């Protein structure tokens, strides 16, 4: 007996298959064991990922930046790049001061299934904050202005690093002030940060060490 294939069934199977592929992406992220940066698919939609990066060195040290990764509808089968949007304005040549989006064109021109992965994006995010000067240089020369999202940040970084660091400091202070804000959306997978409470967290630490 052959089951009739209906358009609705085909779409459902396609979504299930996509879900498994995105779950595989998350497993690859875990296998990379990246330090200081975390990302997880939203509970409500696997095409939306929540992320946060903790920066401990360089001119962005002490900052905690939240971001979202929006995957294209046909991910990973279409060549359109994912979209990375930070929750706040961050002064950086590759981050748009209006939309807070990160330009991924310096990393990838198109998305290629089985060759490119979400952990590549996470490592790129780490790299642009660890070495902002290096992020605006490609093959020993400055990147074209068309590959930059914030010309003022590019100019200051190139000509006056002291002023650049002062502007970056504003981004750091804002991130520290708002890192414990309530989640903007109700999603159980949203990454929530809590203030350190000895009576609560010491018990958790002791429990984890005893296992």
From Swiss-Prot:
CDD domains tied to this protein: UEV_AKTIP
SMART domains: UBCc
Superkingdom of this protein's organism: Eukaryota
Biological source species: Drosophila grimshawi
Domain UBC core: 17-177
UniProt record similarity statement: Belongs to the ubiquitin-conjugating enzyme family. FTS subfamily.
Cystine residue pairs: none
Stated name of the protein: Protein crossbronx-like
């Amino acid at each position: 007996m052959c089951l009739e294939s209906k358009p609705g069934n085909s779409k459902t199977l396609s979504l299930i298959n996509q879900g498994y592929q995105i779950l595989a992406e998350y497993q690859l992220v875990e296998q990379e064991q990246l330090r200081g940066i975390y990302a997880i698919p939203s509970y409500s939609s696997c095409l939306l990922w929540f992320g946060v990066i903790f920066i401990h060195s360089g001119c962005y040290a002490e900052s905690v930046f939240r971001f979202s990764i929006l995957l294209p509808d046909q991910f990973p089968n279409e060549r359109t790049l994912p979209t990375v949007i930070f929750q706040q304005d961050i002064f950086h040549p590759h981050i748009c001061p209006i939309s807070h989006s990160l330009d991924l064109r310096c990393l990838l021109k198109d998305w290629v299934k089985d060759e490119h992965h979400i952990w590549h994006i996470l490592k790129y995010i780490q790299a642009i904050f660890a070495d902002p000067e290096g992020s605006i240089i490609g093959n020993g020369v400055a990147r074209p202005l068309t590959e930059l999202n914030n010309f003022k940040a590019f100019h200051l970084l190139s000509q006056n690093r002291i002023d650049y660091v002062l502007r970056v400091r504003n981004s750091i202070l804002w991130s520290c002030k708002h890192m414990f804000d309530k989640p903007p959306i109700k999603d159980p997978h949203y990454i929530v940060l809590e203030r350190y409470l000895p009576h609560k967290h010491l018990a958790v630490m002791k429990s984890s060490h005893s296992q």
